[in-house]
Amino acid sequence: MTNDVLTSLEILLAYKHARHCSRIKARMELPAVRGLSLLESASGKDTRVPVDPMTSPPYKWICSLLIESARGERFIGSGFKIHLPDVDRTAVVTSGHCTYMYEERTYATKITVTFPGRRAVTVGPNDIYASPEYINTGDKDHDYGLILLPGTSDDGFGWSAIIPDEELNNRTVINCGYPADRPIGTMWITDGVITSHTANRIYYKNVTVGGQSGSPFYTWYGGYWTVLAVHSYGRCPNFAPRFTREMISRFLERMNGLKKKSLRSVAFPHVYLRCDGTGVTRWERPGGGTVNCQYKPPSLWESFYIYPVEMAPSLASQTTYKVVIESAQFRHVFIRMDSQGMNHSMGPGGGEVNCQFTVSPWEFFYLRRETNGSYSFRNVQFPHCYIRLDGRGVDSCLEPGGGIVNCQYYDDPSIPASTWESFHLEVH
């Protein structure tokens, strides 16, 4: 990687080339690559306004991209930082077509990233990523990419991969980026409403043009600006690939941030949470498999990928975030909680903790750090209930495991969890 100060001449040439491409070959995409289109993508009046100053949140998290292909052509795009915990690189999200030249079947040779008021940074193919679906088939549902910048950063947008569909209907949304039809290096913002959505796309009628591919598509949700999707395509309406659990998992894996972890009970310090997902190969309403306990040392059956599916921005004061617990032995199998009917604390616990294929709110948990340094897992669907482990009698390693893992109800879920509902996270 090298640090370069981007010259105005370089950017000007890229903008002129982008505008020329749009005149000779307009497409429905708004790519920063060959065939870039400046076709306005919403009907009616252009409501875009310039952002000034650009150095306060969330605007300081939005960057311009100068992209160079293997053919030596230069194009423009946008990107944005997201808040990811416990990673050793800075994550910049953009469109897959900003990092991978699908028609050339190769990654960009270099991308220069410039944030407002900051020195430009140039990275090469080893530090950029596009989804395998986009690389293999140009799949628009998976047209997302990642740029890895040097150094750690706790700065960035909040985001959600699990916002309920009912929250999207007619929701006001914002797009902000660096359009090619405006002065060099200027950021423009516009709002609109969501017109429809699918599991992988959000459609909307914001005015956008070429150069804005890879810019954040965000809304006010949960008390902060939250990115929901990556703006990538323009027509009437536009659409953007949604943030998904799979996307975040892949980003973390690319950043070496998806690490196996074991959950060791605080109350039973030699006992670990165990998951047997045998036969759990499709979604079924009651879930399946077995979640129980195992004596040390932990194996893959006691190992998990625990990663966020919704995060507050770096400036938020929240101490919890939503995660999934995916089995390392049985990929795509997640810890599930069903505490229907529980409305008070029960000595032996209650409800059921088992497995599910893929995820829903029953598989989402609030991860909270407890005062003793351990962690607790409170369910999103049942927000008064925590995962509980009873390891009595588990004093040797048995093949089917033993003990009980179930639920515990808290009248006030803000109070510290007991040691039976607390776990030490051990990274493998």
Residue ranges and their predicted role:
Residues 1, 228-259:
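C-terminal cap/linker of serine protease catalytic domains
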Residues 1-86, 250-259:
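Protease-domain processing segments flanking chymotrypsin-fold serine proteases, especially trypsin-like
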Residues 57-60, 67, 75-76, 88, ...:
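Serine endopeptidase catalytic core focused on the charge-relay Asp
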Residues 66-70, 148-154, 205-210, 267, ...:
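A structural micro-motif recognizing beta-strand termini
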Residues 80, 86, 207-232:
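Catalytic nucleophile loop of clan PA
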Residues 95-100, 210, 228-237:
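Short beta->alpha transition motifs characteristic of CBS
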Residues 98-100, 117-120, 151-154, 179-181, ...:
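Acidic glycine-/aspartate-rich tracts in secreted/extracellular proteins
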Residues 257-285, 300-345, 361-397, 415-428:
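Extracellular glycan-recognition/adhesion modules and their associated mucin-like linkers
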